[in-house]
From Swiss-Prot:
Stretches of the chain forming a coiled coil according to its record: none
SUPFAM superfamilies: Homeodomain-like, Tetracyclin repressor-like, C-terminal domain
Keyword Transcription assigned: yes
DNA-binding region: 33-52
Name by which UniProt lists this protein: Probable acrEF/envCD operon repressor
Function: Potential regulator protein for the acrEF/envCD genes.
UniProt GO molecular function: DNA binding; DNA-binding transcription factor activity
NCBIfam families assigned to the protein according to its UniProt record, in alphabetical order: PRK09975.1 (NF007430)
Chain's gene name: envR
InterPro entries: DNA-bd_HTH_TetR-type_CS, Homeodomain-like_sf, HTH-type_Tx_Regulator, HTH_TetR, Tet_transcr_reg_TetR-rel_C_sf, Tscrpt_reg_MAATS_C
Record-linked PANTHER family: ACREF/ENVCD OPERON REPRESSOR-RELATED (PTHR43479), ACREF_ENVCD OPERON REPRESSOR-RELATED (PTHR43479:SF11)
Highest taxon listed in the record's lineage: Bacteria
Organism: Escherichia coli (strain K12)
Annotated HTH tetR-type domain residues: 10-70
GO cellular component, one term: protein-DNA complex
Length: 220
């Protein structure tokens, strides 16, 4: 019986986290109370306090348990691209955007991060969350270095600048799309968006190759 009770408690805890994600994304973190979350989850205020001391603890737990976007898209990537760092990078960027476009929970989390939260010192640091939902700087640098070695990224480019541009371009694409999701089909446009960003860093002779790459990547 105790085992079942523990399982039920864990199930309730996760339901509260999922409800909090929906409430935070809709109303904003500062405007959402634990009582709002309890009501939406159809539990008592006492029940939510049994699991979380306060809203900040719930907020932090929500992000701490969240896998990175890099982990979430891994199963949707093509095997065998390890020796082609440029195509590997291209695919990850496309599939990442398409995953966001298809998965409402991911959209809700990103809305919270970009549009619905004012961070304070007690919250998990914004930079930690942004890295979880975006690029790992060291990994991105290593991939870009490999691309330069293979001639896919121009050798005269400063990779620090390239990384800033890539991070700004894709976080900007996602932020703007989340404000007007009906404005365009992010899933369909993902290959073109990625190719136009990457084209800025390619030697001229490689651009023609990119134009002929298939745009038929899909996460589903």
């Amino acid at each position: 019986m105790a085992k079942r009770t523990k399982a039920e408690a864990l199930k309730t805890r996760q339901e509260l986290i999922e409800t909090a994600i929906a409430q935070f994304a809709q109303h904003g973190v500062s405007k959402t109370t634990l009582n709002d979350i309890a009501d939406a989850a159809n539990v008592t205020r006492g029940a939510i306090y049994w699991h979380f001391e306060n809203k900040t603890q719930l907020f932090n737990e929500m992000w701490l348990q969240q896998p990175s976007l890099r982990e979430l898209i891994q199963e949707h990537l093509t095997a065998g691209l390890e020796h082609d760092p440029f195509q590997q990078l291209r695919e990850k960027l496309i599939v990442g955007l398409q995953y966001i476009a298809k998965i409402p929970r991911q959209q809700a989390l990103l809305k919270i991060l970009y549009h619905k939260c004012e961070f304070n010192d007690e919250m998990l640091a914004e930079g930690v969350i942004r890295e979880k939902m975006g690029f790992n700087p060291q990994t991105l640098r290593e991939v870009l270095q490999a691309c330069q070695q293979q001639g896919c990224v121009a050798n005269n480019l400063d990779l620090d600048v390239v990384m800033i541009i890539i991070d700004g371009a894709f976080s900007g694409i996602v932020q703007n799309w989340l404000m007007n999701m009906a404005g365009y089909d992010l899933y369909k446009q993902a290959p073109a968006l990625v190719d136009n960003v990457l084209r800025m860093f390619m030697p001229d002779e490689n651009i023609t190759k990119l134009i002929h790459q298939t745009n038929e990547l899909s996460v589903m």
